[in-house]
Each structure stands twice: as structure tokens, then as C-alpha cells.
């Protein structure tokens, strides 16, 4: 979870899911504890695969606590994307005075071509697309007021326009075809 100012809460509770008959729970591991989970996106082509968005903050750079995107398939974490292995970014990466890694993924959604769109808050390229193992980044700052911070829910319509809620500044609409960005307040 996160606070009203988009700071990670990090309750470290793990995650659970119900398969129609049984509950499965992955509890927190003290050696590599979980950050605050904020959103779950199911793969439309694989009901046993989920992408879990998280907010993290830690001074231990090679742990789940950094925050990022978890890929869970058949009840196992099969991948974890953060600033070390993907374009997902640490919001403090450019500040050498802060001895912490803070990756904040507020949500994700699949489009009708199977691409996963990801909101990575607090950066210039806050919108990412993950397609067939490749990443693309988009600068959506033109759709936000200056000094705006924080993205929330992310959805896609039938025209493949990505709609992203903001913390206090309305909605951003982005369409990759023509690289169109609009801020609606």
C-alpha cells in the first residue's frame, strides 16, 4: 500500500489467491520480505499468471523491498522486475544524498494485443510497455501539471488509449498511435 502522499507503507503481508476450490498463501519471508503490494493484473492469456505491482523502499538494493513488478505463475514468483533488471526506475536514482532504492509501480493493465502497460511513478518516463520480453518507455509529463506527483489506476479502452489516474491532477490519456497525450482535470 501507500500513503496519501504516495509513500510506501510496506506492510509485508505476502499475497493470497483462490483457485475456485482452495486458497493459496505466500507468506512474507524474513530473508527477502515483500514490499507493499498495490495492484494485481491477471494475464488474459494465462489464468495462472499474475503481475503484482508494488511500492518499495530500502537501502538493500538487491531485494524485493526495492519495489517493482512481481510475476507470479502457478503459485510461484517466476520473475521480479525492478531498477536492476528492467527500465523500471528508482525515484531517487539521481539523488546521491539518499541512500535508498524506491521503485513505485502503481498499476498495470494488458491491451488487446497482449502488451502489459505499467505505471512507474515519480519519473519523466512514468509509462512503460512490456511486450514479448522488450520494454518501451513513454514520457507522459505533457499531460500533467508541472510538479505533479503520483499515478494511480491504469486502464485501457477499445482504442488502446491508456487512461491513468493521478494523485491530485485528474486523468492522463495516452495513445501510442501518434504519441498523443492529453491531461484532463
Language-model segments: which ranges?
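Carboxylate-rich, polar loop motifs that coordinate divalent cations or form catalytic acidic clusters
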Residues: 1-185
Amino acid at each position: 500500500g501507500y500513503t496519501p502522499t504516495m509513500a510506501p507503507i510496506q506492510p509485508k503481508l505476502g499475497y493470497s489467491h483462490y483457485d475456485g476450490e482452495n486458497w493459496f498463501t505466500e507468506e512474507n519471508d524474513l530473508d527477502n520480505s515483500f514490499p507493499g503490494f498495490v495492484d494485481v493484473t491477471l494475464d488474459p492469456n494465462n489464468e495462472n499468471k499474475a503481475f503484482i505491482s508494488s511500492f518499495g523502499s530500502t537501502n538493500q538494493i538487491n531485494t524485493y523491498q526495492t519495489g517493482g513488478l512481481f510475476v507470479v505463475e502457478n503459485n510461484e514468483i517466476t520473475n521480479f522486475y525492478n531498477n536492476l533488471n528492467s527500465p523500471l526506475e528508482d525515484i531517487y536514482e539521481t539523488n546521491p544524498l539518499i541512500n535508498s532504492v524506491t521503485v513505485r509501480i502503481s498499476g498495470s493493465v494488458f491491451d488487446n494485443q497482449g502488451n502489459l502497460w505499467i505505471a512507474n511513478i515519480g519519473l519523466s518516463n512514468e509509462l512503460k510497455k512490456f511486450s514479448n520480453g522488450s520494454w518501451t518507455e513513454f514520457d507522459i509529463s505533457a499531460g500533467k501539471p508541472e510538479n505533479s506527483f503520483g499515478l494511480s489506476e491504469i486502464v485501457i479502452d477499445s482504442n488502446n488509449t491508456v487512461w491513468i489516474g493521478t494523485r491530485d491532477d485528474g486523468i492522463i490519456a495516452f495513445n501510442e498511435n501518434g504519441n498523443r497525450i492529453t491531461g484532463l482535470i
